[in-house]
Amino acid sequence: MTNLSAVSTSVPVTPVTTTRNASAQSAASNQSLAQSYTSVTLGGSNAAASAQLYSMSGTAPSTDKTPSWLNKSNDAVSTMMAGNFSSSSLGARFKGLGAALLNRFDSDAGNFSQSVVALPAGTPKGSALETTLRAQTDAQSDNKISLTIVTASGAQVDLTLSNQEDGLSVQVQVSKGKLTDAERGALQKLSDGFQTAIDGIAASPPSLKLDGLTQFDTSLLASVDLHASVQVGGQSQTIDFHADSKQRTVSAAGPAGTLKVSVDLSNLAIVGTAKQQGEAIKRYLKQFDDAQSRGHGDASLVAMFKDAFKEMNSNVTNAAQQARAQSPAAIWLNKADQSMTTGLADFSASMTQEVTSPNPARQNENDTFSYQTSQSSNVSGNGQLNRAITQQQESHLSASYHESLLADVPLRLTTDKNSQNYTYHQIKDDASSKATIAYDKGVLVKASLQQSASQSTRVQKYIMGEMISDQTTPQNATLSRDFLDLLKPLQKKEGATSAADISKLDQALATINNLVYLQPDPLTLRSER
């Protein structure tokens, strides 16, 4: 896109009219809506000022088009839209708009609507073409991002950003009640998080940057929901996000496959320190990378899955600390207990790659990749002195893929038997880890860990279309640990006050914590005995 200098942003871009004969104007009116151009006035808002016309691709148009606005206004949102409309990418079109819409609540708690469409020069205001383009932009199902926020008082705020080649539209609607001043302030605080989420979704390829939408005061805002649909390689990519005081969920579906991550915030007793959570997230992201490598998963799907897992598990510590302060008599984990858990809130996460059949000679040989992982915990007992904690982690991988017999020769399978030289791999893996902790009258009586891992690898080898081998390799391992004798003396040191004693305690507990995570590789698990 050609860079524009000295673009006036004090008011929406002023249309520039060029003189043409009647036949040229008629031809312009019949231009396809798919061909879009924008007129940008340089050096000021005066219509007589010099102007340059650019198409959305950055090339000089064969037919002039000028922007037409729903409402004439020089407010911050409209001014930003005027500057963005000359860009072609979704990210540039939506740049800053999400934050600007939420920041409106600083001075205005009412509804707001604005749209701009590119029309052939000379098209009269209110024409059927303008009405159609504006309606198409508002109704756009792709390249659209919406945010719904329900406040603690019951009011609902809906924000929508829509884009198509010839139109850009934004809307704010407040319903089901009036916003309090405190709620308006809470909405403003989400502005940066909303814009960061938009920037990630509108990027190419899309990414998930949603943690800013999880940072809200639940005493003022009851829930936050985001829905997005964007085009990726000519196909639709959808993203749905929800957060409230009890749960967080994100799901996505697109050309590469589907994913979903849910985090349960109803059992905050198990949540550890921010440092412990950071280490746990790092461990899980490494497991996702290992699963992708072993199962040949789609890189873009796994990258988005990792984003989703990290974002949904962010900013949980503050909520846990607040809950602990509000309910000090409830059962809470001490340092020794936390050393045998991940420190994460309970979750379930899954991703499934789009199935393909790359071998026309054997169409039942599909390339697949499916991965699930979860954590579930239970805290029980009649009080802190008689508490019991269990935490179960699981993961499952199922995958299949084709591979060339020669690493440096790309696989191109056809019905010709000369192309049928390959191996077909089928992977099935399972792993689990269960920690159990129990107290009787304040005395630790149980601290155990049971882990298991199994892997099955089936490889069928074909040469000239004939299967010459079919081999299945199973691997299994189990491991049981008892930490009772190790934890009992450490538990007595939890009241340590000297820096040296605290450091020794933390190091010892970190050593135990290092062992509680899932270990999907049976050989590695077996070596830890």
Q: At which residue positions do the language-model features occur?
A:
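Short, compositionally biased, intrinsically disordered N-terminal export/targeting signals
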Residues: M1-F85, A152, S169-V172, I502-R529
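A eukaryote-biased signal for long
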Residues: R20, H242-R529
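Short, flexible helical or helix-coil boundary motifs
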Residues: T41-A49, A60, S73-N84, L101-F112, ...
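N-terminal "first-domain core" detector
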Residues: P61-L129
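N-terminal, intrinsically disordered, small/polar-rich Type III/flagellar export signal
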Residues: F105-V224
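Short helix-loop boundary/capping segments
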Residues: K209-T249
